[in-house]
């Protein structure tokens, strides 16, 4: 019995076609189909050769057969779980391949859509013919003339006064003798200026008219 339980048969599908793995000890059927088969035989009163042999054996043989059925059921469930995990892992393994294909297609589209950059050719500029420069004499003529320093002289006697000269309102410079208006016949009208200044400082005040009621 110990040798039989230690031997693990190769995986094989159930003979009834349910999709689970069968066991040669249960006539090539899975544990569920085998239990249904035994129930049918008990109901119909027909016992298979394996069923009669199991019935003639002691209660210990019945418990051993039940344990075998349970182990076969566990093996079938483990095999089914492994197949489901493999089927789930297949799209996960194939996922990087699809990503690579999509990336390759995107890169090809980018290469097609991106325009070719035009290579800018170096522009060669030819030196323009040298223009004849004007002579130094013309440049000197065009240069602005520096203002001559004004000599401080009296407008009447042409005496050098320097910084001691007097500016008159007529716009001329005079010495100490000719600084007065009666000495150099000043054309400036002092009377008109004084009258305008007086009118500005002393405006005419007119009382408001009385309105009759």
Swiss-Prot record:
**Residues modified as N6-acetyllysine:** 209
Task: Name the chain's protein.
Answer: AN1-type zinc finger protein 5
The UniProt regions of compositional bias labelled Basic and acidic residues, in chain numbering, are 139-148
State one Pfam family annotation. Answer: zf-AN1
Query: Which residues of this UniProt protein bind Zn(2+) 1?
Result: 14, 18, 30, 33
Instruction: For the region Disordered, give the residue spans.
Output: 39-149
Q: What is known of its domains?
A: The A20-type zinc finger directly binds polyubiquitin chains and associates with the 26S proteasome. The zinc-finger A20-type domain is essential for inhibition of NF-kappa-B activation.
For the ligand (Zn(2+) 3), the binding residues are: 168, 170, 184, 186
Keywords, in A-Z order: Acetylation, Cytoplasm, Metal-binding, Phosphoprotein, Ubl conjugation pathway, Zinc, Zinc-finger
Q: Where are the zinc fingers (AN1-type)?
A: 148-194
Name a GO CC annotation attached to this entry. cytoplasm
Q: Which residues carry this modification: Phosphoserine?
A: 48, 58
- The organism is Homo sapiens
Report the record's disulfide bonds. none
Oligomeric form and interacting partners: Interacts with ubiquitin and polyubiquitinated proteins. Identified in a heterotrimeric complex with ubiquitin and SQSTM1, where ZFAND5 and SQSTM1 both interact with the same ubiquitin molecule. Homooligomer and/or heterooligomer. Interacts (via A20-type domain) with IKBKG and RIPK1 and with TRAF6 (via AN1-type domain).
Cite the residue ranges of zinc fingers (A20-type): 8-42
Please note every region of biased composition (Polar residues). 40-75
Per its UniProt record, what PROSITE patterns does this chain match? Answer: ZF_A20, ZF_AN1
Which tissues is it found in, per the record?
Answer: Highly expressed in skeletal muscle. Expressed in fetal cochlea. Also expressed in infant brain, fetal heart, pancreatic islet, melanocyte, pineal gland, placenta, corneal stroma, and parathyroid tumor. Weakly expressed or undetectable in adult brain, heart, colon, thymus, spleen, kidney, liver, small intestine, placenta, lung and peripheral blood leukocytes. Expressed in rhabdomyosarcoma RD cells (at protein level).
MF terms per GO, please? DNA binding; zinc ion binding
Note the Gene3D superfamilies from the entry. Answer: 1.20.5.4770, AN1-like Zinc finger
Tell me the InterPro entries matching this sequence. Answer: AN1-like_Znf, AN1_A20_ZnFinger, Znf_A20, Znf_AN1
